[in-house]
Amino acid sequence: MQLSRLLSLFLAIAVVTTACGSDADDSADADDAGLTVVTTVAPITSIAANIIGDRAVIIGVVPEGTNSHTFEPAPSAAELFTDADAIFINGLVLEEPTKNLALANKPESTPLIELGNESLEPAEYKYDFSFPEDEGKPNPHLWTDPDYALTYAEIIRATMTDIDPGGADDYQANYDAFVEIVTELDQAMVASFATIPEANKILLTYHDAYAYFAQNYGFTVIGAIQPADFGEPSPQEVAALIDQVRDTGVPAIFGSEVFPSPILDQIAAEAGGTFVDTLRDDDLPGAPGETDHSWVGLMRSNYITMTSALGGDPADLEAFTPRNVADDDAEYPQ
């Protein structure tokens, strides 16, 4: 992982906190103070839960299995933002309706942190068929890359320390423990990916959630099938993709549980590839409260699937046990 980038971010956003009030006040749990943190998509909720622990109530807004790009929260969700002490969203134009509702209702003092925007410089944005540059929509899926997930975790740690300085030691300890888990995951990913033939490290997905991951783990994304309007590609575009699959020898075409599409079956059948439809973009595996129902569990599940479909051996990922820093009591809408 690119630890130098993480260190640079740490230095850039590190906050200096000054103890205030009595020792008793500083040691009081944030739960007692009634802190509420609102998040959007489930992977961000999970990362936040690992860093924040029991120092705040954490409430997700975007239901799992929903198209987070177009999801519009009910007006009743405004109350969540009114009561929020911190709001963490992905940003990068992912959850605009949710962001707009938050901005219209949150207290002026409540920070709304766009984690993706804080993690990337504009020059680092990735654009493709699903996320065209001329529409100003960069690919927002940073959380599928463990390196960026750690960046998100560090931003959350720093933000919460600023809001709740009495919890600084807890947030730091949780972050350190999360780094250990993610480092183990990264090692299992690297070992498993090393078993994939180099010629097979090619990704063609329906919804491109892996552009940043591919950059850091030695894969090449040759295309995404879903257009920017989240509709279906035209017959001409499908024909071009079939030719591309034949020319490159892509062994597998990856779909998404959130975006089922018969087009993928057609492309795979006509081009001779295998269609795999079990990847999850932001829908965590398992049920809330289960260990697999976590960002770590999501990464393990997706990359076992990807490794197997591309001709590799996912034994190291299968041996990796997903876990959270502590019990995850966050609210995940279903």
What are these regions (language model features)?
Residues 9-11, 19-334:
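Extracytoplasmic metal-acquisition and chelation regions
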Residues 1-7:
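Bacterial N-terminal signal peptides that target proteins for export
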